[in-house]
Amino acid sequence: MPNVKLPTGADLHYEAFGAGEPVVLIPSTGFSGECWKPSQMPIADSCRLVLHDPRGCGRTTAPQKVYTINQMANDVVALLDHLGIAAAHIVGHSMGGRIGLEMTLNFPGRVKSLIMAASGSGLAPRPGADCVPGAPHWLVHSLAAHGFEQTLREEYTDTSAFFTDEWRAQNPEKVEEFYQHVIKTHARVSEYVHLVIARHSWEATHRLGDVLRPVLVLIGDNDSGRANHVVQAEALKNRIPGARMHVLKGQSHGFPWQAPEATNQVILDWVKAHA
């Protein structure tokens, strides 16, 4: 698919597959829409699947270097306008869930349902030194001490942050395939830092009671590292009216890629129930 120049100012790359209930997948910090292709494409067998590269990632360009969660939510709404989709099921992983939540709060009529996968509502419910606005200390230190590529390696392949230790030990080739696939269109260092700052400068915990659409909180029970998404998931479930939570056993932050079949089934069952 070609890029589309949106009224939000982004020249946004997207792809659409299949037919049926519209499902928009929003990726994590720095990832492009390509990240979903090894794992989530079966969703297109029964749904209209929409992938895109957020600002600063892949083949999308935007005129400014300062990004916000609000901007990226507006981009998704503008993409739906371009595609003629009145409302869609939004599935956001990590920062993608934050973008989806911002969209749900600001444009509830455009959201049929929201799945927040390994995500959160901002810094307020999170424990630890990672929870400060702007660029977190660990990122600044890692970039200075080890460089950009090693920082990404540590996050995605060399620790249990994304994949559990047992699965990494048993599937080193799959871990490396994942890294080589996503790094091709991953945000570069400048854009990545700006995206992290956007993520850490956003807060919606005080607005969770205003969510009007059905929400599923999807979390791996081992996703309790630096950002402790397990704690964040509990906060989402407890504060969003009517929210449901599904826990994937034996999974960490990267469960869409470590357990794609289970992840896809949860998504499809949820979409069917809220069509």
Identify the function of each model-found stretch:
Residues 211, 217-219:
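Short beta-strand/loop motif that positions the catalytic acidic residue
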Residues 105, 112-148:
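Flexible "cap/lid" loop of the alpha/beta hydrolase fold
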Residues 50-95:
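Active-site loop/oxyanion-hole signature of alpha/beta-hydrolase fold enzymes
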Residues 224-232:
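Conserved alpha/beta-hydrolase "acid-adjacent" motif
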Residues 6-62:
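Conserved HGGG/HGGXW glycine-rich cap/lid loop of the alpha/beta-hydrolase fold
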Residues 99-103:
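Hydrolases whose catalytic domains are alpha/beta-hydrolase-1, hotdog thioesterase
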